[in-house]
Amino acid sequence: MKNHTFKYLIIIIFLFLSCQESINKTRTTNITEEEKLLAKFEPEDGKCILFAGQELEAIGGLEKWNDGYYDHFDAPGGFTMYTDFSPGDTMFGYVLKGLDGVFSTDRWGDYPSNMSLQLEDEDFNNSALAIGLWLVNHEKEVADGIQDKLINRMGEWLKSLGRRPVFLRIGYEFGGGWNHYNREDYIRAYRRIKDKFDAMGVVNVAYVWQSHGWDEPMEMLESWYPGDEYVDWCGYSFFSRWDETNMIEFARKRGKPVFIAEASPTISTPTVKTNGKTKETIFSNPEQAKEAWEKWFVPFFNTINDNPDVVKAVSYINCNWKSHPMWFDNPTFQDVDARLQTSDFISKKWKAETSKELYLKASPDLFDKLWGEEK
């Protein structure tokens, strides 16, 4: 009898331990599955959406604007443009009306912008859209509801784009001194825009919180953060001081993907930290093109390759900066012509690098991939 009791006890203990192991395995599996959940429009690890920007000449692909990125390289996975909620402000003689560059061709010191031309052109049919939304001088008005008409108009327009993924960079480069945003008003404005769009049923937008990318301690980033429920992607700009960023670390801790939302070769001089001055970099100059590749492109691609779990989108600015009035007096961009197509050396290397399976370009199934069931 005692032997039978002992056997039964052993069997009960074995069954109990087996159940516990099964429960633990289930819990581990569930945790693993939760960790693999992707953000809105985030591709799987080891994939990166390639964008090009950031005005009509730089991007090309149109009958009138036909010497830009789309005319010399494979159509990218997305294109980057800009607009604003800053009606009444003047930029280089142009008076902003709000939503400039969305429905009409407008020029505010950069080269002309008009998203409607691109969205109506079949060459752009399979490319996502990234938008830099300027709020400068008006973040409090936006936060207080004074600009709700612009928010509503933009929301209806976004819905009209159907399944085209839109990456909306609200108040991009929020901490840059040149934007002089008020932190509290900026956060309130960011949240109001998203809340309004959510209430309107806008579902084709991923919300990107983008810093300028350098001289940003972790505590500073924390203080400007709108909150996990308001941010789909973290973003930053990749220019001359690319090695100073904390955004990748910040995003990884938050479980957010990273969009390098502005990237163009600018090479530091010894005084870059005091006056922002970068070296002359003109791609049609073979020596300067080689230096740009070694000192900027190599670190740029290394950043992508070294962070496949986080860096999931990048936007190259294919711009002749020095020819735009906006940048004539800007020490960072005034001596830069970063158009890839003006250098055979850089063009070949760019094509070789971006032809790797890592990069997502325009394709008939790109939107389906970005709209995956788990997103």
Question: What do these predicted ranges mean?
Answer:
Residues L17-S18:
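C-terminal motif of bacterial Sec signal peptides marking the signal peptidase cleavage site
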Residues I49-S160, W296, W321-I346, T354:
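N-terminal carbohydrate-binding/catalytic regions of secreted carbohydrate-active enzymes
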Residues G53-L56, Y82-S86, W134-V136, G171-E173, ...:
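Active-site beta-loop-alpha junctions enriched in small/polar residues
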Residues F103-E120, N125-S127, W233-V272:
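Glycoside hydrolase catalytic-domain groove-lining segments
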Residues G46-E57, V166, T269, T274-K375:
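Substrate-binding cleft of secreted/luminal carbohydrate-active enzymes
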Residues G78-T80, N126-A130, P165-R169, N204-V208, ...:
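Structural preference for beta-strand elements that scaffold enzyme active sites
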